Structure formats: C-alpha cells, structure tokens
C-alpha cells in the first residue's frame, strides 16, 4: 500500500505544463487506447501531483457504441499512482448533467464499471464512445446505470480504474486511480465543477472491488476529498477463494483473466507460471490479454487451470508466491472512512456471500459506518439493477447530509419484495428507454 509521503510528486518539482484540450470530433471512430496518442502522458508528468489533469478532450458517447447520447462528456488524462508508488497516467470520462449552469454545485459520483478484462476494448474511456468496437465488453451495458445517476442531477466520473495496462485484480491502485480521477474532475476548468462538490462512489462486481479499494484508501490517500458515501456492490472480497470457487466452472474465464493480469504485477507469480505452466497454458494467458470479458468466458467455459500445469493445482496455489498474491489482493486491509452500503446476494454463484459477510464484519469491527444489504432472493446479475433504486436513494441521503439510521448493520429483506423497488425500476425503465433510443435525459430523481 502506498504511503502519501512516497508519492513522486511529493519531492519533485510540480509539472507546470498547461493541459491541452481537443475539441469534439463528431462521428470519428475512436482509436484503441494502445494506438491513441491521447493516452500517452507528456514528458515531465511524473512531477505533477496526483490528480493533475495532463490533457483533455470532448467526446461523443453512444450506447453499445451505436446509439449516440445527447450528453456532455469530457475525457481527462491525469497523473495517478500504481500499487508500488510509481507515477502513471490514466483516463476518466466525466459526464455533466445537461442543465448544470456554470459554477453551480451538484454532487459528483465516481462510477466504477466492471471492466473485468485486460483488453483496452473494455476500458470505459473506449467502450462508452460512439463507434467503439467493444463487443463482449460489460462496460457498454453500464451506461444505463451511469444514465440513472445523471438523471438524479449528478455529474459522473467513470475512470479506467485498471490503469493503462488493464491490470485487473491488482490491489490498492484501483482505489488510487478512482480518487485521482475525482481530483482531476474537480481540478478541470473544462468540467466546471465546484470545489465544494460532495462525492459518492458506486460500483458492482469488478466495479464494486475498485470502489472498495477507493473507500479503503481515501482516508489516507485522499483526505482532501469530501466523500460522503460509497456503495460496494458484490465486491470480490477474496480473490483466492473466488479463484477456487470458479475454476473449472462455466465462469472459469474470469479467474483466468485475473491470473493473466496479476502476473504483470507480481514477479513471483510470473516466475511460478514460467516454471510450471505448459506451453498451452502460457499461450492461453497471452491470448487472454487481448480478449474481452465475454470472449474469455466463452473460450474458458468449464476449463480447469490445473490442466495447464506440471504439478497439481492445489500445490501451486499453496506456494509462498501465490499465497502472497491472494493475501495481498484480499479486501479489508484498511477501514473505509466514509459510510458504506454493501450489497450482496446470498445465492450469488460468482461471489461467495461468506466472503462479503467477513468483509462487512471487518469494516464494522474497525469502526466503519456499514449498511449491509444481504439479499435473500436475488443472484449476482439480477441484484445490480434490482438494488439500483435503493442505491440511488441511499446516495441521495448521503449527498443531502441526512444521518444514518440506527439499524444500519445488516438487512435481509429481498429488494424484490420492497414496493419502492418497483417504483424505482419503473423510473429506470424510462431512463433505459431514452438511452436505447438516444433521447435527451431529463432530471428524474427518485
């Protein structure tokens, strides 16, 4: 975990370049991040403080890359920090409500997508753009949730929280990228947000994991930010347990993607793979770096990672190098300072509810304000939309400064049996219809 005093910008001279801005280019097919000069930071950027905007541009967004959205979107390349304290640059896409007047204060939500892949086709800054070729990216569908937040009258920051290399599963640094993306949004003159803006975090599944790292890091890494609440939807609390749970199942592609990414963050893991993976296994991990999430799930359905090793899988998982990785990537190393709402399905086939029970207990024992919705009816995919009305109401209360209720530790009543869920889902259906037809969103708070 990075100590604030170890940041490169803390000892170097501040980068004093003026960030250049690119005006909107309509109907232009976006380049992949690996080929797009916008993503490459200028010389000397490492001396900038985290959250400094290095360049910006206006972009068109489109649902599934095809249906243009009538929203104002600005992308910011900004300086941030990786898990080892080294400077890097990544991008956030900031969307501002159409009716927001210059200088007007509105809440800012950092929405973390379930990128869940190394391929830059899945990065929000690419996948959300008009004419993006991102078939198989989960990110494109999440424009519906982002639009629901915009309809509340909130500005939304959507960071590439896996960083420029798509290192899914790496600890700590997703939180730094989220927090520095918020700083960049507040610092950007182009975006025009007030410094007094209250801030919320929201993400589900892989996005919930990134949101959890941000919630855990913000007290020490970004005490300057007024983060009033964080919603952690089905975060991956224990990657080691999840690997064992999903390996060999229809969703085996997900842990395989994580291993493909983590070998780039942990030299010890890379060494174990080099020594024990067969040629087919090494070739597969290389191919996974270019696959979208859906591609990987289809290709790896039912595959057992042990089939690509020269020793039993459990022996490999028990090595000091792999044990260190799984221990390091487990949530709960710090206690969130803002109030958190944790949402988890009891019958989740992807994330074991016991992992999230343990995480909630750890946060509560550490003194965090935890509201835990432990849903008895839903499963992994359905709980995200079904819990969205509850999430939006909870965030609205945090932005309004309302006190938390006394009964905030754990609820089990299924969202599907709550009448307010249906009113909220009806509202979300109207928003989804407007997104799918490319119509302008009007403010429709719950």
Swiss-Prot record:
Q: Which Gene3D superfamilies match?
A: 1.10.260.130, alpha/beta hydrolase
Q: Which InterPro entries match?
A: AB_hydrolase_fold (IPR029058), Lipase_secreted (IPR005152)
The name this protein goes by in its record = Probable inactive lipase MT1628
List GO BP terms, alphabetically. lipid catabolic process
Recorded superkingdom: Bacteria
Q: Which residues form a coiled coil?
A: none
Task: Give the molecular function GO annotations.
Answer: triacylglycerol lipase activity
Q: Which family does it belong to?
A: Belongs to the AB hydrolase superfamily. Lipase family.
